[in-house]
């Protein structure tokens, strides 16, 4: 029986979408338990049944404008900080929030804490492989760090491997290193050193360097990057996809009658593309290297996204991903 | 009267598209002169008139698989190396190729040479602002370097400013620094230092940090980045746009009869988006910081792209961009 500590107040549509998504997940996964941290009255207005759900009243909320580390230190009775302490104290097995990303990362690092041997936990995101039905890849670190060292990129290769095995059920996942060219001799000082470290570990199915133009085509299952570049690439992909969809919509709307009819006939197809590109079914971003799953879903998450993210957390807990991490790093570092 | 040294053999459709594009530009710009380096016989098979065009016979070609620096050193009679020497020796004012990017960069750095005071020239690319008709922005460095220092990013801010003023006729162009957040306190060691250097120069219209998700929306005219991140972002944007267009096409093709009719009715609109996203009318990538314009058009360039790239080179020469660079850096460095 595993328990998830949920920041019920984080996110644009909180607590509504969080509570609805949690209830849906509760109905699907009878072995899961939930601790909902937040404004009890507001939560109860939405909650239909408190089966397997415990509500913990908190009085503060960390919002999107709060400076992360400061907020974690000062808002001691916030839904996020209280949820993080529940994990730290062993009352819950995972931390989940749709709120301020920086604050969640800070709570993960400073309250939940790092696995011994992992110097800089990294944020793992899941993105769609656009050319393959249902395909996906992970990008790690997608932004927990602004500066990384080669050894940390090597650790991301290992963390990403265990994640892909545990949660995505991929045997021997293909690990690629994000670089400015595919040839082994190409790269920055950082990627050249990281390349050698990863290549030297025969337990990793290393496919070598990958370029950002190819990752959406599924050239590997896990893309390892430093947090600065990973973040820039993630946001470039999201920005381009979002802008392209807007452009398509605007173009159809201003295309005259025939164009509008065309748009109408194509609507189901365009919705299919939109869904493929949308993040909701791929779950949340995971801070890998923390002592427990620390998971962030998008601020604009609806109940569906919350549900899928709980499913993802359940996969991590069911397959005991954290024990695999700690076993490995306690033995090897 | 300005002269452009053209590598007529570089690119997927060379010399055909190169010669056709040059002739079109020759007809448009009577003050320009061209030196076409390559296989004279092949060039003459395409050339309709040699007015203002001189052909220089060369016997070697650097292809896409050649290792750049090695190729520059060994293939002394290649069309690219001979064209670069023409610039170095003052016989031509600019270097243009659609061939191997690395080799062109190496020729720019090692043969044409750097402007005094500029330690690491950067590659400037032009991308479309998707939300604004005809809008565009520059990204610099988009991949000439794998590792950059803060002072170099500051130099890119200056080089980008002069470029936008000279070629794009933008008064007081808005310069942004690519970063992992817009707040001034965010960033890597590199971007934090670069931010301070750029912000301290009151001659620069610095709009602060920009994120890769916003640059396609035109938040600034010039995006300054280190070459590794700039390259990753450029390729992520190109990869996402390309994959999205493919996905749209595939979805229409498999959408059944109504969907296909819809696709047909929408075809003009979709072509409009494609054109907006396509690189051809935005010209080539420019190695800024070299002693003369060193310009690379896409390997798959058609005659139209070659024509637009010559127009872009003409703008740089007409507005004497290089003198502005050298005046500034000779005075200030």
From Swiss-Prot, chains A, B:
Q: Gene3D superfamilies, per this entry?
A: Isopropylmalate Dehydrogenase (3.40.718.10)
Q: Does the keyword Lipid biosynthesis apply?
A: yes
**Function of the molecule:** Catalyzes the reversible formation of acyl-phosphate (acyl-PO(4)) from acyl-[acyl-carrier-protein] (acyl-ACP). This enzyme utilizes acyl-ACP as fatty acyl donor, but not acyl-CoA.
Complex and partners: Homodimer. Probably interacts with PlsY.
Report the record's Gene Ontology biological process terms. Answer: fatty acid biosynthetic process; phospholipid biosynthetic process
Provide the species name. Answer: Ligilactobacillus salivarius (strain UCC118)
For this protein, the Enzyme Commission number is 2.3.1.274
Q: Name the enzyme group at the top EC level.
A: transferase
UniProt similarity note:
Belongs to the PlsX family.
Q: Which gene encodes it?
A: plsX
What the entry lists under InterPro entries is as follows:
FA_synthesis, Phospholipid_synth_PlsX-like
Catalytic activity entry: a fatty acyl-[ACP] + phosphate = an acyl phosphate + holo-[ACP]
Q: What is this protein called?
A: Phosphate acyltransferase
Source organism, top-level taxon: Bacteria
* Keyword terms, alphabetized: Cytoplasm, Lipid biosynthesis, Lipid metabolism, Phospholipid biosynthesis, Phospholipid metabolism, Transferase
Q: Name one GO molecular function term.
A: phosphate:acyl-[acyl carrier protein] acyltransferase activity
Chief place of localization = cytoplasm
List, alphabetically, the GO terms of the cellular component aspect: cytoplasm
């Amino acid at each position: 029986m595993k328990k998830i500590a949920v920041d019920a107040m984080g996110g644009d549509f909180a607590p509504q979408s969080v509570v609805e998504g949690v209830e849906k997940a509760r109905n699907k996964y009878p072995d899961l338990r939930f601790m909902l941290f937040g404004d009890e009255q507001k939560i109860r207005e939405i909650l239909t049944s408190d089966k397997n759900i415990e509500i913990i009243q908190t009085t503060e909320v960390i919002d999107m404008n709060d400076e992360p580390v400061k907020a974690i230190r000062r808002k001691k009775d916030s839904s996020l900080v209280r949820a993080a302490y529940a994990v730290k104290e062993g009352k819950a097995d995972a931390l989940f929030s749709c709120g301020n990303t920086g604050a969640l990362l800070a709570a993960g690092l400073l309250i939940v804490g790092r696995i011994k041997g992992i110097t800089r936990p990294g944020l793992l995101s899941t993105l769609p492989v656009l050319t393959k039905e249902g395909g996906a890849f992970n990008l790690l670190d997608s932004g927990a760090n602004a500066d990384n060292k080669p050894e940390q990129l090597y650790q991301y290769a290992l963390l990403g491997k265990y994640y892909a095995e545990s949660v995505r059920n991929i045997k021997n996942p293909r690990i690629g290193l994000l670089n400015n060219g595919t040839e082994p001799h190409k790269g920055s000082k950082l990627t050249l050193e990281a390349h050698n470290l990863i290549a030297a570990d025969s337990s990793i199915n290393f496919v070598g360097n990958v370029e950002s133009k190819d990752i959406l085509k599924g050239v590997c299952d896990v893309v390892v990057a430093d947090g600065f570049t990973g973040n820039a690439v993630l946001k470039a992909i999201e920005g381009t996809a979002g802008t392209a969809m807007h452009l398509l919509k605007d173009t159809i709307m201003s295309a005259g009658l025939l164009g509008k009819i065309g748009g109408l006939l194509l609507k189901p197809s365009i919705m299919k593309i939109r869904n493929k590109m949308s993040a909701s079914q791929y779950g949340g971003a995971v801070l890998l290297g923390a002592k427990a799953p620390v998971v962030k879903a998008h601020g604009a998450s609806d109940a569906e996204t919350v549900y899928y993210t709980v499913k993802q957390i359940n996969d991590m807990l069911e397959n005991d991903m954290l024990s695999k991490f700690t076993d490995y790093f306690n033995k090897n570092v």
